[in-house]
Amino acid sequence: MFLNPYIKYVSKNVISRKRIKFLYQGKIVFVRLYNGEVNSVVKPYIMRQFFKKSMFVFLFGGFVYGALEILWRGYTHPSMLLLGGICFLIIYGCEQRQTKYISPLSRAAVYAAFITCLEFIFGLILNIGLGLDIWDYSDLYFNLCGQICLLFSLLWFVLSMLCIYLCKALRFFFEK
């Protein structure tokens, strides 16, 4: 059983005590146990690395989304940091998969639809359900319940194109 890129900087002497074979391929260390199970020393390391990376991506997406909203309308709401983090984390996860067979335009359209759906769900919960009135698109054309509109869906499409290339840059940053 081979494990993927989360095992990078594991020292040889710690793992060799647990009867592990090493197979080096570039900078990434692939680990295989004799019995095919995940090592009790290696598994927590993998989970810590995965959690740190996911938390960084989540916070990065949340703060970038919050900064964009502040630039666009002058203020933001803390729940928008949560929404931005969730959206970027899921987009980053999708971009980690083999996406070379799908065009960037198609991926951006799917991501824009996904972000619009999440914006609608958050709008129903926060604006209509809890009455926070964080945003209101009622005065814009082609809106749905005042929570989403076509104009912002197109804006999400453009920003999704930028996110695709930002995900590539982050992946390069993490692999260094």
Where are the regions that the model predicts?
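Aromatic-rich, lipid-facing transmembrane alpha helices and their immediate juxtamembrane interface loops
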Residues: 2-10, 23-176
